[in-house]
Amino acid sequence: MVTGASRGIGAATARLLAERGAAVAVNYHTDKDAAETLVAAIEAAGGRALALQADVTDAARAADLVARAERELGPVDILVANAIGVGARAGRPSPLLRTAPEDALAVVDAQLRAFLHPVRLVVPGMVERGRGTVVAVGASLSRRSPEGFGTLSMAKSALDAAVRTLAREVGPAGVRVNLVAPGLILSELATHIPEPVRAANAARTAVRRNGTPEDVAHTVAFLASEEASYLTGGYLLVDGGTAML
């Protein structure tokens, strides 16, 4: 199951996991056409997928999502928690001193709900079966806080902490929990970022380019695979080397 999978990182991840043999529940919130187009492409390539609408920040709707997914596709063995729950506005710069506390709290709350609701529904089954993996999609700014992104940084920091805690709690049962932390990724959510800013960011990376959804998807797929069986509680940067410069 990939939450927030109709576009960007979520869509690229769902497509790649399907290519590698997974039956994928493609969760979307509002973009039904994009989700169904993705499912059609997966099926045309010989894969198996199902588009399922749900706002995963809502407990009842998340429960319905998981029930439908498991009824149609079987138990969830891989959960990719990609949905942030607040849309593109969370990624728009706003100085922290000009941010109303209730607005900041709303972003943090939505991020944690988008992670915790699916986790609470599928991880107990993983624990019972003695296997399973959760990969959360965070952001590099959870540990590097650029100007104007304090609210999103706080939300992703909370997600980072939740991942580490859950990894410790369910590790003895054979369930792994990791987080990928992308830098600037040129997905649909980055369309509001001016070209000069994109160019400047690319110049700050060691590889001199911005990231793509596929860059993140390959990291997620690795963490979800048996090749990463000894990796849990991990925080994997996918930022082109920006953090080391």
Feature locations, PLM:
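Conserved glycine-rich Rossmann-like NAD(P)H-binding loop of the short-chain dehydrogenase/reductase
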Residues: 20-37
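Catalytic Tyr-X3-Lys loop
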Residues: 97-116, 131, 135, 159, ...
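Short, small/polar-rich loop/turn modules that mediate ligand/substrate recognition or access, typified
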Residues: 171, 176, 231-233, 239
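Alpha-helical segment proximal to the catalytic Tyr-Lys
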Residues: 124, 168-169, 229
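Substrate-binding pocket helix/loop in short-chain dehydrogenase/reductase
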Residues: 90-108, 190, 201
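The beta1-alpha1 cofactor-binding region of Rossmann-like NAD(H)/NADP(H)-dependent oxidoreductases
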Residues: 32, 53-65, 101, 214-215
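Active-site helix of classical SDR
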Residues: 119, 155, 163
